[in-house]
A protein has these predicted regions:
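Short, high-confidence coil segments that cap the C-terminus of an alpha-helix
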Residues: 111, 131-133, 327, 401-404
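Short functional linear segments
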Residues: 1-46, 53, 59-66, 71, ...
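Beta-strand->loop->alpha-helix junctions that form or flank phosphate-binding loops
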Residues: 194-195, 207-229, 249-254, 281-287, ...
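Acidic, Mg2+-coordinating active-site environments of NTP-dependent enzymes
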Residues: 110, 118, 131-138, 154-155, ...
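Nucleotide phosphate-binding/pyrophosphate-handling subdomain across enzymes
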Residues: 37-38, 134-137, 145-158, 162-166, ...
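C-terminal helical cap/extension that packs against the catalytic core
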Residues: 197-207, 211-216, 231, 302-305, ...
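Glycine/aspartate-rich loop-and-adjacent alpha/beta segment that forms the canonical ThDP
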Residues: 412-430
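ATP-dependent carboxylate-amine ligase catalytic core
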Residues: 22, 26-37, 63-152, 170, ...
Length: 430
């Protein structure tokens, strides 16, 4: 099987649909000899901030000298990013070889796996072969019925910020979303929650009490942000009498220091089981890279790409715009999935927007850009719709002055097209 054949095989699974339950994942992993049982995990669920949190945790473990695995979704640029070893995506050769190996077992199953279940099995086999010391494992959707939830008790279960998202699958209340995420909490385990919502916190506390798990909630009162610029933040944070001073996180966005506080709270728990020095923590955070999170793609005009795609995520983007650009109104390029309730997101954005360029992300679930443009117009914002992302970006650049700010947001699925379009425009890259 070649690399292209492997991708064709993986993506060809989609027609089998999205089906609830862990039975298929368990079956294929059993056929593979249960590679996950030879690994240790930090399991990460939540609505927003999962990717950045996973990236920071992986970087810290790697700086501490551990061989790391990282499992994430969705990928941003290339599929191989879904599973990484020591900070590098799986090679084309390894992906082809392991996919062919796993496919021989998948084809024997009467109830065939979904795409995500197949990829999870490929990832587990990859991490086993690489003999990872620790795998940072991000859920795909929810928690309880997510195919990553076939692992035993993880070294820590980490739950990032909770908000209403994926209403069809997770329900339309904070309690229903939190209940799904709480599925990664296992008997006797350590659990760390970001702590942004008291309703969610109560759900997690109840689940922890029921199964004998220990819950820690991030203390943002102990977070002192000294500096926050478009180039990142510097802050102090105290957790369990450990003071982390002058921590530099190179990821822009005012929300990243809070994500980092979640990571530091988790690391303090993990120090009981792993040899992680304060130097490794500081160096790991300082080295982290994560595209599409309030990322500056261009300086004149300033062009920012952000993956915010639900009210909490958009609020984080809006807060960052206010912090970095004060009273300046921005030009927005936005594309979303059709199943999103965009009204709360637009209500947050509208006071900051002077013009909107709506586009269609490269995904069959994408919302018609004209429908999104009309929703902007209903709020008094001039908006133009484009089916082609490159044309939308080009028109925004054409309308922008050198001191303007353009922000592309609404879906991670359009990041690659946005970045490519910006590169094609000969703007002054930083």
């Amino acid at each position: 099987m070649t690399y292209d054949e492997a991708l064709e095989y993986i993506h060809g699974i989609y027609w089998r649909g999205s089906k609830l339950g862990l039975s298929r994942t368990r079956e294929i992993l059993e056929l593979l000899g249960n590679p996950q049982k030879q690994l240790k995990f930090v399991h990460v669920a939540g609505t927003n901030g999962k990717g950045s949190t996973c990236a920071m945790l992986e970087a810290i473990f790697r700086k501490a000298g551990y061989n790391t695995g990282l499992y994430i979704s969705p990928y941003i640029i290339k599929f191989n990013e879904r599973m990484q070893y020591n900070g590098e995506p799986i090679s084309d050769t390894d992906l082809a070889e392991i996919t062919e190996y796993v496919s021989t077992f998948a084809e024997t199953m009467q109830d065939k796996p979904t795409e995500f279940e197949l990829v999870t099995a490929i990832g587990m086999e990859f991490f086993k072969r690489k003999k990872c010391d620790i795998v940072i494992l991000e859920t795909g959707l929810g928690g309880e019925m997510d195919s990553t939830n076939i692992i035993d008790v993880p070294e820590a279960a980490v739950i990032t910020a909770i908000d209403i998202d994926h209403i069809r699958e997770l329900g339309g209340t904070i309690e229903s979303v939190a209940s799904a995420k709480a599925g990664i909490i296992k008997a006797g385990g350590d659990v760390v929650y970001y702590g942004n919502n008291p309703i969610a916190a109560n759900v997690f506390a109840t689940k922890c009490a029921a199964v004998g798990a220990k819950l820690s909630i991030v203390d943002f009162e102990s977070l002192n942000v000294k500096e926050c610029t478009i180039n990142g933040a510097i802050f102090d944070y105290t957790v369990n009498d450990s003071l982390y001073e002058n921590v530099h996180i190179p990821l822009p966005g005012t929300y990243q220091s809070r994500n980092c506080a979640l990571v530091l709270t988790t690391i303090e728990l993990l120090k009981k089981k792993f040899d992680i020095s304060k130097e490794a923590v500081i160096e790991g955070i300082a080295s982290v890279k994560w595209p599409g999170r309030f990322e500056v793609l261009c300086r004149k005009p300033i062009f920012i790409a952000d993956g915010g795609h639900n009210p909490h995520g958009i609020q984080g983007t809006a807060d960052s715009i206010r912090h970095h650009f004060q009273n300046k109104k921005v030009m927005v390029i936005m594309g979303v999935m059709a199943d999103k309730d965009v009204s709360p997101m637009l209500d947050i954005l509208t006071p900051l927007v002077k013009s909107a360029y709506t586009v269609k992300p490269n995904n069959p679930r994408a919302m018609d850009p004209e429908l999104l443009a009309e929703k902007f117009r209903e709020r008094g914002i001039a908006a133009t719709a484009y089916n082609d992302i490159e044309r939308g970006v080009a028109c925004a650049f054409n309308d922008a002055r050198p001191d303007d700010v353009i922000c592309a947001l609404g879906s991670f699925y359009m990041y690659n097209d946005i970045a490519d379009a910006v590169k094609k425009l000969t703007c002054e890259l930083s």
